[in-house]
Amino acid sequence: MYHYAIFGGIVLIVFGIDPGYAIVCWGAIAFQNNSYRAIGYGSVETEAHTDFNARLEYIYDELTAILSRCRPDALSIERLYFQTNQKTAIKVAQARGVTLLAAQKLKIPIFEYTPLQVKTAVTGYGKAKKPQVMEMMRRLLKLEEMPKPDDTADALAIAICHAQAAGSALRRVLYDRGTHYQ
C-alpha cells in the first residue's frame, strides 16, 4: 500500500489529516515532477460510547502505526476553525493534539493550512463545496472512484495543498542554487 517508485526528479511524500475524534481521515500522496499519486488513504474511527480518553489513545496508536509504515516527508493538517459548538471544538482539538504528537514523536515536520488555502490549492476557488473538492481529488490523483469516507478526500486535498506549497519553495531554492528542476 505504501510503495512508490522513483523515476527521476524529487519525490515528496506528504501525509494529510482531516482531524476529528469520531473519525480521523488521512491520505498519503507522492508528489514528483508536478504530478500527484495516491499512496494510500483511509480513516481511524472510534466507537461513540467509548471513554473519550480511550478514543484519544486509539487515535494516537493507530496514526503512529500508519505514519511509521508510510514514513512521510511532511504531515499537513487542517487548521481548526469553529464558529458555534465549543464542546465539539474542544474534543476535535484534543484529537488533533494526539495526531500532532504522533507526528512529532516520529520527527515528521508538521504544516497547517486553513480550509480556504486547501480549497484554493485544489480547485482554484476558496469557497468550493465538498463535491467539487472530491471530484478534483478523483481527477488529480486519477482515482477510479471517490475515496470513502468523504472526509478522506479532504485529507488528500490537505496533502496536495502542502505538496504545492513545498514544491514551490523547493523550486525557488533550486533556482537560487542554479539547479534545474522540472
Which residue ranges define each predicted feature?
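Phosphate- and other anionic-substrate recognition elements at nucleic-acid/protein interfaces
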Residues: 2-182
